[in-house]
From Swiss-Prot:
InterPro entries: RNA_pol_sigma-70_dom, RNA_pol_sigma70, RNA_pol_sigma70_r1_2, RNA_pol_sigma70_r2, RNA_pol_sigma70_r3, RNA_pol_sigma70_r4, RNA_pol_sigma_70_r1_1, RNA_pol_sigma_70_r1_1_sf. The gene is sigA. Residues 321-391 are annotated as: Sigma-70 factor domain-2. Sigma factors are initiation factors that promote the attachment of RNA polymerase to specific initiation sites and are then released. This sigma factor is the primary sigma factor during exponential growth. It comes from Chlamydia muridarum (strain MoPn / Nigg). It holds the Pfam family Sigma70_r3. This is RNA polymerase sigma factor SigA.
Length: 571
């Protein structure tokens, strides 16, 4: 009996030692990884360690050691975050600038925002949806909404507004049928609005009993409910309804100013008849505005406070969704670098696409937000590149044609091993050779003359281009010497001979004149001028004179072949 007890104690000690060793193994693994999974705990612990109480003790022990226990799904998510963090760190290192560089700071700050699970995305979307419903409900209480809706409906009927910009198309099955119903809907709204105005004016009657007031208020509430139902039949997009809200806020400011004016006049009205008259006028003005709004001042203030609160909640939820998906923008934007826009510009354009995706996301369809947002972000980035990347803007459809031609050229080059001719490329794509040449010409990127060459920044591209309009110093010196020598030689001729040569060859202003034009200056015939010119040229060919000018023949030949013009030699 004693031996059995000793054997049992020895077995318990061995088992306890094994458990201790396994726990140490768990802690070591957790410290190496920074966490441990439930699957790893089950693998490491011995099979005998299977009761819930024992497992709980192990989990309590690990918690006391600050060891994080995760599910396998959490581990995969954590690995994905680490991978993204490394990518962001690499981008931050590659982005130029000092530690306070905006790109670096943006990437660093963005990396601290955790990603959302599908459940969290749905929860945020529900918050946005709830806020939008409440915003719409409050805005449609005001008579301003009726006037705005009727105005927009008239624009739709007359074709002055795009249907998809105003109406939520998912709510409308038949566009033609909807447009045919609009006139009837407008008529019903106007009737309800007139009825509402009549009841509001009737409430002002001081002779009304409490019972009549209660009856009128009840009728008013029913009228408002019917009006809101008709307004919802317009199926306006949420951003259009929010535009109605801008009218409400603008009117609210004028209400507050009028209320302040009334409060100031109340103090002075007791001892000043003029102030009392102004107070009465201000109160009448306030009443007219209350009728125009369809709400009393107190109701107006209460509704606006609620409207602002729900708008803040909507913005907060949208901001949370956007900030949690900024990494998605980075992952897409980095694929479009070196296409004419800076990385920061690509991020900004992608963020605008992300915000549009948040506005239009429908969580009930079942897909993840990132799947839906990818298309909006990509569209925003590619559209920005098409619109802004080039100095001379190329339409989006032409960008697609250029890409098609470039892809076709690349394919033919891989098949044939040489650059395809316009004829070969046109045959492959169904274009004429001239069309292919035109597309290639459009695809060329203009280069700024101020573009820096090299890393030093000391020289620009324009410094390496020849300016044919500027005279070289050697030519300028040569022509200056020729001009001086020509003056000396011409002085050896008579005044008439010198005048004829200067004007016949354009030595004065660079424009040669005809015999008739020179003859009119001397009032002689063309033949007489020709004789004077021939005599003067014979004198110029004399060795004494021609010897002085022969050295400049090369300069004159170069000038004739270069520009085809003769320079003037005027002082």
């Amino acid at each position: 009996m004693r031996m059995d007890t000793l054997d049992s104690q020895a077995a318990d000690a061995a088992q306890e030692e094994e458990i201790q060793r396994k726990l140490e193994e768990l802690v070591t693994l957790a410290k190496d990884q920074g966490f441990i999974t439930y699957e790893e705990i089950n693998e490491i612990l011995p099979p005998s360690f299977d009761s819930p109480e024992q497992i709980d003790q192990v989990l309590i022990f690990l918690a006391g050691m600050d060891v994080q226990v995760l599910n396998q799904a959490d581990v995969e998510r954590q690995k994905e975050r680490k991978k993204e963090a490394k990518e962001l760190e690499g981008l931050a290192k590659r982005s130029e600038g000092t530690p306070d560089d905006p790109v670096r700071m943006y990437l660093k700050e963005m990396g601290t925002v955790p990603l959302l699970t599908r459940e969290e995305e749905v929860e945020i979307s529900k918050r946005i949806e709830k806020a939008q419903v409440q915003i719409e409900r409050i805005i449609l209480r005001f008579r301003y909404s009726t006037k705005e809706a009727v105005s927009i409906a008239q624009y739709l009927i007359n074709g002055k507004e795009r249907f998809d910009k105003i109406v939520s198309e998912k709510e409308v099955e038949d566009k033609t049928h909807f447009l045919n119903l609009l006139p009837k809907l407008i008529s019903l709204l106007k009737e309800e609005d007139s009825y509402l105005e009549e009841r509001l004016l009737a409430l002002k009657d001081p002779a009304l009993s409490k019972q009549d007031q209660a009856k009128l208020n009840d009728e008013l509430e029913k009228c408002r409910i019917r009006t809101q139902a008709y307004l919802r039949c317009f199926h306006c997009r949420h951003n259009v309804t929010e535009d109605f809200g801008e009218v409400v806020f603008k009117a609210y400011d004028s209400f507050l100013q009028l209320e302040q004016q009334i409060n100031d006049l109340k103090v002075r009205a007791e001892r000043n008849k003029f102030a009392a008259a102004k107070l009465a006028a201000a109160r009448r003005k306030l009443y007219k505005r209350e009728v125009a709004a369809g709400r009393t001042l107190e109701e107006f203030k209460k509704d606006v406070r609620m409207l602002q609160r729900w708008m803040d909640k909507s913005q907060e939820a949208k901001k949370e969704m956007v900030e949690s998906n900024l990494r998605l923008v980075i992952s897409i934007a980095k694929k479009y670098t070196n296409r004419g826009l800076s990385f920061l510009d690509l991020i900004q354009e992608g963020n605008m696409g992300l915000m549009k995706a948040v506005e239009k996301f429908e969580y009930r369809r079942g897909y993840k937000f990132s799947t839906y947002a990818t298309w909006w972000i990509r569209q925003a980035v590619t559209r920005a590149i098409a619109d802004q990347a080039r100095t001379i803007r190329i339409p989006v459809h032409m960008i697609e044609t250029i890409n098609k031609v470039l892809r076709g050229a690349k394919k033919l080059m891989m098949e044939t091993g040489k650059e395809p001719t316009p004829e070969e490329l046109g045959e492959e794509l169904g274009f004429t050779p001239d069309r292919v040449r035109e597309i290639y010409k459009i695809a060329q990127h203009p280069i700024s003359l101020q573009a820096e060459v090299g890393d030093s920044g000391e020289s620009s591209f324009g410094d390496f281009l020849e300016d044919t309009a500027v005279e070289s110093p050697a030519e300028a010196t040569g022509y200056s010497m020729l001009k001086d020598k020509m003056k000396e030689v011409l002085k050896t001729l008579t005044d008439r001979e010198r005048f004829v040569l200067i004007h016949r060859f354009g030595l004065l202003d660079g424009r040669p004149k005809t015999l008739e034009e020179v003859g009119s200056a001397f009032n002689v015939t063309r033949e007489r001028i020709r004789q004077i010119e021939a005599k003067a040229l014979r004198k110029m060919r004399h060795p004494i004179r021609s010897k002085q000018l022969r050295a400049f023949l090369d300069l004159l030949e170069e000038e004739k072949t270069g520009s085809g013009k003769i320079k003037s030699y005027k002082n």
